[in-house]
Amino acid sequence: MASPDVEYRCFVGGLAWATDDRALETAFSQYGEVLDSKIINDRETGRSRGFGFVTFKDEKSMKDAIEGMNGQDLDGRSITVNEAQSRGSGGGGGGRGGGGGYRSGGGGGYGGGGGGYGGGGREGGYSGGGGGYSSRGGGGGGYGGGGRRDGGEGGGYGGSGGGGGW
């Protein structure tokens, strides 16, 4: 009963900003028929977020691609290829996918941002400041930007904090 819903999809991370959907499809098509290839772009800037997905027609092609492409060079960047986690979560999974914004900072923004998360939970300004301190790879800026939920000005601090990666 679940077989029509099964997708043989790979998550591809560490992509160069210059890599587009077509380049992704070309790189992976050697492993089997590619049904879809999609680079995820930032909603505000339109620039690549450095990851995407490739959907294959069958499981063997997907597994061969993971085996063959993980750790390989694509457009000058060493990429990470894993099986995409897509089961059982439309809305919930989307929320966690968006949460990948603070994970993509290397985890430092999320872990170090604990000060901003706990201490600045009510005050957007403090949350944004915490994001700035914890942003070793600029990831803290994304998390600080999340402070906008608490106050519109917190987002502003988060944005500038992200630029000053430590």
Curated annotation (Swiss-Prot):
**Gene3D superfamilies given in the database record:** 3.30.70.330
UniProt region (Disordered), positions on chain: 68-166
Matching SUPFAM superfamilies: RNA-binding domain, RBD (SSF54928)
Single biological process term from Gene Ontology: RNA metabolic process
Q: Which UniProt keywords apply?
A: Nucleus, RNA-binding
Q: Where in the cell is it found?
A: Nucleus
Question: Know the name of this protein?
Answer: Glycine-rich RNA-binding protein GRP1A
Recorded source organism is Sinapis alba
